[in-house]
Amino acid sequence: MLSSFAQKVKAFIAENQLLQPESTYLLALSGGCDSVALLRIMIELNYHVAAVHCNFQLRNAESKRDEMFCEGLCWSLKVPFHRVYFDTKAYASLHHVSIEMAARELRYDYFEKLRKDISADDILVAHHQDDNIETVLLNLIRGTGIQGLLGMKPKNGHIIRPLLSVSRKEIEQYLSSIHQDYVTDSSNLVADVMRNKIRLEVIPLLKTLNPSVSDN
């Protein structure tokens, strides 16, 4: 019997016609709470996935820890595992972009290349409700207009977001219920970039005014 979390994700996938049972998907696996939950739920729902982990070489021993965790998790679950190393700082300097933008460009370019190499149909990423509200607020602050206020799409080209209907709290509860651990990226806990400031300071304030803000 499927868990209530699995049922909710399954319904969202069906409602938006995101996945097909006969297809193969490339799943972006950082080792964090969200992507680990995505991997476990895709297995629970019997989808065919291969995982890819990006080591951006930005956090020294922590980056290696994350990589080894992902490798071990995929080995235990019998999921094909791919990894890639990036010189993120050099790329950022060469292209005159922020570290965050460099990491984004590097990973999505590589995801598409690997998707073609392994003949995967689409790429799965673990964005959820909380990420979506962060994106809307970030776009509002940047003044991106009406289009930016629409937030993330469940599917955009070859990028699919099966977890957009669930919150970070629901994800944490799901992993706890199946006794699945994960790693924590310490850089996400510091309010030194705009998205982190929104996550750590703005959204908690909004939730004091409306506890269901991420559901809207």
Where are these regions (language model features)?
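An accessory alpha-helical subdomain
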Residues: 206-216
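Core alpha/beta nucleotide-donor-binding catalytic domains of modification enzymes
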Residues: 1-203
